[in-house]
Amino acid sequence: MNQTGRTIGGPQNGVNTVINPFRVSPSEDRVSSRDETPRNYNNPFLNEDDTRRAHNSSVSNSRQERLPSYEEAAGTPKQQAPYPKEKKRSSGSNSHQHNHHHHRRTSHGHRDKDKQKSKSRTKVKPPKNVDTIDKMDVTGLFGGSFHHDGPFDACTPQRNKNNKVAPVLAFPADGPNNTVGGRTSKKSTLDEVFGRETVDDDSETLNQLQDRAYLFNKANSSTTTLDAIKPNSKNITQFDSKMKTELVHGPITMGLGSTTFLDGAPASSAAIEQDVINHAQESRRKNSIARKKSLPSRRHLQVNNNNLKLVKTHSGHLEQKDVDDNRTSVPVTATQGSGHEDVVKKENTGNKLLRRVKSLKTSKKH
């Protein structure tokens, strides 16, 4: 077949050859059919390179058509071989290596033991039958040397081991420690709102005083605590710590109220009377040796004595005060000799001068 599509010759060697009118190279002249028999590459129109290329393509096509075998998929025997071992050393090196491995094993064993010991040290074993109060007891070297009956037993009384003197019985509800406070006078807001409050404060105070008087010197009705502390003792009296005694006031100062008793407590009336008597006795002893006064001077002193009054000063001492002249005299000196009292009066210098002038005028007239 020529370039127009005609067949040039018949079949050669059993291969149907068809000339491609669009061929570029002589290798394209030969177009194989799908059901052709084994090819003959002795084509006089093909050169050596075209023949080799055609052979390789046919081989690759045949390989693609069939599945790979197990050996091809698994690889070569060299690839399947394990990793080569190290070469064995001499006998001396073997012993050294054995010792080295043994040393490693022993070191690992020691490390494991040390770790176990450290863990056992950090983990503190809690003592048995020990609560928080037992741990707080510093008398025991390692804590919890013995069990204490403490506040936990108030919530769990069944834990109490000592039934005679137990901490639960230290403050019973009706014991003396819970009744010392007395009645409180705190007002309730609800009582005021609903009208349950007593309006009269005096009656409320009176009721409180009556209750206190009733509770005073009353024997304690609780026998549990008393029998636990002091058996067969029922003479403990009850007292009220809020009862106030009568305050004793001293001399009143200007703007400061009563004194603070820094110089001692104020004297009683009986002590003041006894002090006056003692001063009178001392003055009588001193004046017993002195000259007796004349009768006119005694009369003058008796008249002035009627106008004198005992006055308590700021310091607490007694002084004489003249009502008419508002003159203050020296402390009282009373004598009980001839039936009258001699009082030495302190006079101002101005009064003495006036009296002297009056006496001179009267003497000139005579």
From Swiss-Prot:
Residues modified as Phosphoserine: 69, 288, 294, 359
Positions with biased composition (Basic and acidic residues): 26-38, 316-327, 339-349
InterPro entries in alphabetical order: Pal1 (IPR013226)
Location of the protein in the cell: Cytoplasm; Nucleus
Glycyl lysine isopeptide (Lys-Gly) (interchain with G-Cter in ubiquitin) cross-link, chain position(s): 78, 187, 242
Compositionally biased spans, kind Polar residues: 328-338
Record's keyword annotation contains Signal: no
One term under GO cellular component: cytoplasm
Annotated keywords: Cytoplasm, Isopeptide bond, Nucleus, Phosphoprotein, Ubl conjugation
Protein family: Belongs to the pal1 family.
Descriptive protein name: Uncharacterized protein YHR097C
Source species of the chain: Saccharomyces cerevisiae (strain ATCC 204508 / S288c) (Baker's yeast)
